[in-house]
A protein has these predicted regions:
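Sec-dependent N-terminal signal peptides
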Residues: 4-15
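Sec/Tat signal peptide C-region and signal peptidase I cleavage site
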Residues: 16-20
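Secreted/extracellular ectodomain signature
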Residues: 21-134
Length: 134
């Protein structure tokens, strides 16, 4: 019985999702032209790749993104990328978007700000401007 209980406990520990807090970006930010281009590229994905996370510096100049190349992806550990951003820019960095939902809290955007991958570049830029990111 102890053996079965130990195995069940081990399986639960190995298969559980991590609910650690993600460092979401906050504060006023204006995306640079390059960051906007990267965001558009990230939102659209290529082939079977699906957007996973878009990391941004608080000055809007540094950005990077993660893709999910498989169907059932779990969130990755973005902290090394956020730390690299902070080391490179000497500013605060955080997650700007998870999948196609903008998480950055600038006090202007609506709670549920989602970018459609079928929107044109101009439509995406217009929404970013409306939400206070341009």
């Amino acid at each position: 019985m102890k053996k079965i209980l130990s195995i069940v406990l081990l399986i639960l520990l190995l298969c559980s999702n991590s609910y650690a807090a993600v460092k979401k970006g906050k504060g006023e930010v204006t995306l640079s032209n390059q960051s906007v281009d990267w965001l558009i590229q990230y939102i659209r994905g290529k082939g079977s790749k699906k957007p996973m996370a878009f990391i941004l510096s608080s000055n809007g100049a540094w950005s990077s993104y993660w893709y999910c190349g498989e169907g059932a992806c779990r969130d990755g550990n973005f902290m090394p990328t956020i730390r690299k951003c902070e080391a490179d820019t000497d500013t605060e960095c955080g997650i700007f978007a998870r999948r196609r939902t903008i998480l950055w809290d600038n006090g202007v955007k609506p709670k549920k700000a989602v970018i459609n991958s079928k929107w044109s570049d101009q439509e995406i830029k217009d929404k970013l401007k409306e939400w206070g990111f341009l």
